[in-house]
Curated annotation (Swiss-Prot):
Family to which this protein belongs: Belongs to the PNP/UDP phosphorylase family.
Function of the molecule: Catalyzes the reversible phosphorolytic breakdown of the N-glycosidic bond in the beta-(deoxy)ribonucleoside molecules, with the formation of the corresponding free purine bases and pentose-1-phosphate.
One GO cellular component, as annotated: cytosol
Name of the protein: Purine nucleoside phosphorylase DeoD-type
Signal sequence extent: none
Subunit text: Homohexamer; trimer of homodimers.
Top-level taxonomy: Bacteria, Bacillati, Bacillota, Bacilli, Bacillales
The reaction(s) this protein catalyses: a purine D-ribonucleoside + phosphate = a purine nucleobase + alpha-D-ribose 1-phosphate; a purine 2'-deoxy-D-ribonucleoside + phosphate = a purine nucleobase + 2-deoxy-alpha-D-ribose 1-phosphate
Keyword Acyltransferase: no
Length: 235
């Protein structure tokens, strides 16, 4: 048992999916997993363990943003020995050729968060995904015929920005999309020597205003979960 997770030792699998929304964690468990048990309800941040294609997998809600996901990733690794962590969530496209419903696999994540500046004063640490997980997720997506993009994303500390100038400039440097957690996940995975990946679906485009319908969002979300689960069980 840790501060924010009430699971007993052995109740959490070595491979875990990390949606921000705890209700998405519940949906994933009920829709994709078998023999499901709920191991956490502290602060309503639901966590479940079950099996997928005969392999043990867990799903844990993390909340939104760098501080929240950092809490859960730290505890999952340090207290429960989790080895493979895959964030599953949505993002907003920045590049013109990135379309809604595309799947983005984050190779790395730049950020406006000060998280790493606290650890590396005066330096910019560049956290990266685990290549084995990335390759497995990419292969799983392309085998399903999905449009999968791999590249850099922006992990932002602010959802409602007063100006999009910096986001536009990052787009000029090839950043694909913006979200709010990947930098923290990849940094902590590097710190503790475990494997991490972010698999994201594009729910809207920051500059064109295009966005998915609720039905499209659910279909794409399901496809993303299958990609993440297929990668997780191969580790």
């Amino acid at each position: 048992m840790s501060v924010h997770i009430e699971a007993k030792q052995g109740e959490i699998a070595e491979s875990i999916l990390l949606p921000g929304d705890p209700l998405r964690a519940k949906y994933i468990a009920e829709t994709f997993l078998e023999d499901v048990t709920c191991y956490n309800n502290v602060r309503g941040m639901l966590g479940f363990t079950g099996t997928y294609k005969g392999k043990r997998v867990s799903v844990q809600g993390t909340g939104m943003g760098v501080p929240s996901i950092s809490i859960y990733v730290n505890e999952l690794i340090q207290s429960y020995g989790v080895k493979n962590l895959i964030r599953v969530g949505t993002c907003g496209a920045i590049q013109k050729d990135v379309k809604v419903r595309d799947v983005i696999i984050a190779m790395t994540a730049c950020t406006d968060s000060n998280m790493n500046r606290l650890t590396f004063p005066g330096f910019d640490f560049a956290p990266a995904a685990n290549f084995d997980l990335l390759k497995k997720a990419y292969d799983a997506g392309t085998e399903k015929g999905l449009h999968v993009r791999v590249g850099n994303v922006l992990t932002a500390d602010v959802f409602y920005r007063e100006s999009m100038d910096m986001v536009k400039k990052l787009g000029d440097y090839g950043v694909l999309a913006v979200e709010m957690e990947t930098t923290a996940l990849y940094t902590l995975a590097a710190k503790y020597g475990v494997n991490a990946l972010s698999v994201l679906t594009v729910s809207d485009h920051i500059f064109t205003g295009e966005e998915t319908t609720s039905e499209e969002r659910q279909t794409t979300f399901n496809e993303m979960i299958e990609i993440a689960l297929d990668a997780a069980i191969q580790q």
